[in-house]
Amino acid sequence: MLLYRLGQQPHIASTAGLGGLYSDGRWHEVGTPILYTSEHLSLAKLEVLANAATLPRNYFLLTLEIADHASTQYLEVADLPPGWNGLPYRRETAQLAQSWIQAGTHWLLRVPSIHSPNEYNCLLNPLHPDHAQLRIVSTEPHPFDARLKQ
């Protein structure tokens, strides 16, 4: 199974989830190593564009491969607390993912995108033993079409 991630150098090359150590997110608290990926490149793009005030520049695409049978915990919209998709981030939502990481049972947590709830992002726990099986397929420049932010 392929997963996609967009970001800038030098951070895009790391799969250690170090960004979670420095800032919080919808699915984690500060100090938590976590790697955000998307099941589709188009969703990865949507996630970046939704959080960018201007057209992202100097972005790279990281394509990852994991086994189709990778241990995964699934969350659907019905499993999430009211307001899970609002701002500021809900503490309850981050706590769901914190519990997943602390349990250490599953390598991936598959969560709905707030921008397209019928599509999914996959969060990877870099502390899980299966993370050693993660394979980098490619890292390549990925420019955004100027028409996406006018």
Regions found by a protein language model. Name each.
Residues 2-16, 27-30, 55-150:
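Active-site and NAD+-binding cores of ADP-ribose-processing enzymes
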Residues 31-37:
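A short, exposed loop/beta-hairpin motif centered on an aromatic-Gly-Thr core
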Residues 41:
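Contiguous, structured surface segment used for ligand recognition
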